[in-house]
Regions:
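Short Pro-Gly-centered flexible turn/kink motifs
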Residues: 2-17
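A generic structural signal for short, non-catalytic loop/turn and secondary-structure boundary residues
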Residues: 6, 39-40, 234
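Residue-level marker for beta-strand->alpha-helix junctions and adjacent short loops that shape enzyme
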Residues: 13, 84, 132-134, 202, ...
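Terminal connector regions
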Residues: 14-44, 51
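Short, well-ordered coil/turn segments that N-cap beta-strands
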Residues: 41-45, 73-75, 121-125, 191-193, ...
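Short glycine/proline-rich turn/loop motifs
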Residues: 44-50, 159-164
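Aromatic- and glycine-enriched glycan-recognition loops and surfaces
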Residues: 49-142, 147-148, 176-180, 220-230
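Active-site neighborhood of glycoside hydrolase catalytic domains
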Residues: 103-110, 117-120, 142-258
Length: 258
């Protein structure tokens, strides 16, 4: 539009007299020194619960895994997917995303008990979330079907479990919700040291129920994500955030500042 401006992604380049290896090391040094949050801080040795128990989370198992990693000199335990859901419990991957309340059948004493248990073992505690997502089988989607990325006059495009959907971060209400996911967890449990921020679906449904200009979705989605992450980092500057995204789906310099 007239008089409208847009900031494109930054371009970084390097010169190397040692081939590709030298160029790679240059970028690594630049990333640690200038881009990634806490880039030169020594990272804690951690154990993540996912491959050990998947979604079969319970207090006894988490306590045991914390004790195991502590006994080996580890410093951090991260509880992965499967800890949440009320009306729809997260026992498989086809439900509950967006319903970020503790499953009291699995964890009757809540997250606070796990944080305290980690401290008793002499380690820190971290937690998994996927705040940009929901499922068709969730209380969030039942309340806000207009919050998901969806092309007009087209069926839903679903991801993992056949039910996963992407929330539309171009929508300020969705931005507030996603920030609130992190803020609520951290407000209730301020000693959490680490968040594993997953994102197992990309923008595969090319439409917004919020935007007037549909071709702005990609740009406005990422602007919205940046606004959320700016708010998170401003309020929780010392929190370590892992950009998981099915492993390395967000391993890029653009996400590193947060």
């Amino acid at each position: 539009a007239a008089k409208e401006s847009i900031a494109t992604p930054e371009l970084a380049f390097t010169i190397s007299d040692s081939g590709i290896g030298g160029a790679s090391r240059n970028f690594h040094k630049w990333g640690r020194n200038w881009k990634i949050a806490h880039g030169n801080v020594e990272r804690r040795i951690l154990l993540n619960s996912w491959e050990g128990v998947y979604m079969d989370i319970n207090e006894k198992g988490m306590d045991q895994m914390m004790g195991d990693i502590a006994s080996m000199g580890g410093e951090l335990f991260v509880m992965d997917d499967g800890w949440f859901g009320d009306k729809y419990r997260r026992v498989t991957d086809n439900s509950s995303l967006g319903d970020w309340v503790v499953d009291r059948q699995k964890l009757p004493h809540g997250i606070g008990w796990l944080v305290e248990t980690a401290e008793k073992h002499g380690i820190r505690f971290g937690i998994w979330i996927e705040p940009e997502m929901t499922n068709t089988k969730s209380e969030l989607y039942e309340k806000h079907p207009d919050w998901v990325v969806k092309a007009q006059n087209r069926d839903l495009v679903t991801g993992r479990g056949g039910t996963q959907l992407l929330l539309d971060l171009s929508n300020p209400a969705v931005q507030d919700f996603v920030f609130g996911v992190v803020d609520n967890i951290m407000t209730e449990n301020p000693d959490i040291a680490y968040i594993k921020w997953d994102a197992n679906m990309d923008i595969s449904a090319h439409g917004s129920q919020y935007l007037k200009n549909q071709n702005h979705l990609y740009i406005e989605y990422h602007r919205g994500l940046a606004k959320v992450l700016d708010r998170v980092r401003a309020k929780y500057p010392d929190l370590t955030i892992q950009a998981c995204a099915s492993g390395g789906g967000r391993a890029n310099y653009g996400i590193m500042p947060w």
